Amino acid sequence: MKTIIALSYILCLVFAQKLPGNDNSTATLCLGHHAVPNGTLVKTITNDQIEVTNATELVQSSSTGRICDSPHRILDGKNCTLIDALLGDPHCDGFQNKEWDLFVERSKAYSNCYPYDVPDYASLRSLVASSGTLEFINEDFNWTGVAQSGESYACKRGSVKSFFSRLNWLHESEYKYPALNVTMPNNGKFDKLYIWGVHHPSTDREQTNLYVRASGRVTVSTKRSQQTVIPNIGSRPWVRGLSSRISIYWTIVKPGDILLINSTGNLIAPRGYFKIRTGKSSIMRSDAPIGTCSSECITPNGSIPNDKPFQNVNRITYGACPRYVKQNTLKLATGMRNVPEKQTRGIFGAIAGFIENGWEGMVNGWYGFRHQNSEGTGQAADLKSTQAAIDQINGKLNRLIEKTNEKFHQIEKEFSEVEGRIQDLEKYVEDTKIDLWSYNAELLVALENQHTIDLTDSEMNKLFEKTRKQLRENAEDMGNGCFKIYHKCDNACIGSIRNGTYDHDVYRDEALNNRFQIKGVELKSGYKDWILWISFAISCFLLCVVLLGFIMWACQKGNIRCNICI
């Protein structure tokens, strides 16, 4: 009897294997998308944190630590400031007639000549820096009646006393200093920059010893401007053994204009002019070393790549640079929404589609197919839908860079102490611009991320609809991104569905017949396999009970004899 019961139960299990889902006359085809075990969190318009399969960092947060010498021409100021090089400080003679794209001033730079001040220092520095050259042309000024080329022990060239090489210190000759009236026309086709100065003696005695008169006067004029300076005689803090000073001024003479110099003393005269050019050159204060490398973007911290649309290394930049923002990180989604693959698929090892989760390990594409048929299981990527999504996403980063990279941004804005209010206003404007750009950057990236996720979801839906239209009534949508195909569909058949050559008419009759042969109601729950197994197990148990009851009834009636041997 035990043998009979066991055989009955085994028979039930054998019949159980003939489930519709595992019948050779049907197949399952699922559509899915790429997934990774650990995705990247990005921000969208509707969600602060959403996980995607891949994302690109948009904020450059570090520099190379050195200033690249290419493609920009970098001039290292070393121990010289730009103004000292302009005036011709003896220890800056090596900078005469030099050219640059970016002049790098060092914190160790110092002056080593007659102590001076420049009332409009920032403007002169900016003007010369943007010109990009120290090209100097000597001119023959007629300084009749005075001695030229004054010198000072505070300004030594080698071991002998000297003076600024681009300036001519005029002083008395034979205790005479006549009034000077000199003109110099600009017959060229470019602007000329003249540097001149006024000497402020420390005592009245020094004044008369050098210029005879108790008080001098200097007036420099053009058709467009006039400057008059009266020396201020008096002692000042001692610098390099001197308590007197020189004030440096500058005048631009346009083509066709005339430079007119009138003086009755204290004039530090020009020896010629500097050519003024219009260009993209500039100046930067930095102690970063200059290295042999190539980078379009330079900051005081060093060069940085410009392959990202934003940077937070330094707000001061030169060249084609990413836009400065306050954020440390902004991530652009370059992949689809990530739904990690579940580890279990039920008792039958069933496959699942994109509605349930993504597929890990699909390296050949973002979208693809998995199938289960009489020949086994398989997987293949759909390259067309993958490429359609990639083509639209790849251009995002380049478009962001084009929108945000600044070409030769004004890197430094300086003002004298007198212009403190203007400086405060400028700082406020710059800070406001940075705040706005930081907000715009975050909003722009969130919009792009939202579009990327919507785009990749749309491509998945397009592929699903394309497949559904091919299969028509030959298959049933299982509701999880899969189709149950009601006809025998080998690997060649599956391949025709993937490449769009499937002919549903060929399989239509077979699919309809198989639909009618399937008994019962197919459950749509995720626990379908479990319920089917439990149902068959209960059925087999009841069958065994009925069979056992029949045997016992037959034994009672004498129709069956049961011998028990011990």
Curated annotation (Swiss-Prot):
Pfam families: Hemagglutinin. Keywords: Clathrin- and caveolin-independent endocytosis of virus by host, Clathrin-mediated endocytosis of virus by host, Disulfide bond, Fusion of virus membrane with host endosomal membrane, Fusion of virus membrane with host membrane, Glycoprotein, Hemagglutinin, Host cell membrane, Host membrane, Host-virus interaction, Lipoprotein, Membrane, Palmitate, Signal, Transmembrane, Transmembrane helix, Viral attachment to host cell, Viral envelope protein, Viral penetration into host cytoplasm, Virion, Virus endocytosis by host, Virus entry into host cell. Its main location: virion. It is found in: Virion membrane; Host apical cell membrane. Disulfide bonds join 30-482, 68-293, 80-92, 113-155, 297-321, 489-493. Major glycoprotein, comprises over 80% of the envelope proteins present in virus particle. One of its GO terms (molecular function) is host cell surface receptor binding. GO terms for biological process: clathrin-dependent endocytosis of virus by host cell; fusion of virus membrane with host endosome membrane; fusion of virus membrane with host plasma membrane; viral budding from plasma membrane; virion attachment to host cell. Belongs to the influenza viruses hemagglutinin family. The record marks 345-346 as: Cleavage. One of its GO terms (cellular component) is virion membrane. It is a single-pass type I membrane protein. The chain crosses the membrane at residues 531-551. The gene is HA. InterPro entries: Capsid_hemagglutn, Hemagglutn_HA1_a/b_dom_sf, Hemagglutn_influenz_A, Hemagglutn_influenz_A/B. This is Hemagglutinin. A lipid is attached at residues 555, 562, 565 (S-palmitoyl cysteine). Palmitoylated. In natural infection, inactive HA is matured into HA1 and HA2 outside the cell by one or more trypsin-like, arginine-specific endoprotease secreted by the bronchial epithelial cells. One identified protease that may be involved in this process is secreted in lungs by club cells. Residues 1-16 form the signal peptide. Homotrimer of disulfide-linked HA1-HA2. Residues 552-566 are cytoplasmic. Residues 17-530 are extracellular. Glycans are attached at residues 24, 38, 54, 79, 142, 181, 262, 301, 499. Binds to sialic acid-containing receptors on the cell surface, bringing about the attachment of the virus particle to the cell. This attachment induces virion internalization either through clathrin-dependent endocytosis or through clathrin- and caveolin-independent pathway. Plays a major role in the determination of host range restriction and virulence. Class I viral fusion protein. Responsible for penetration of the virus into the cell cytoplasm by mediating the fusion of the membrane of the endocytosed virus particle with the endosomal membrane. HAMAP family: INFV_HEMA (MF_04072).
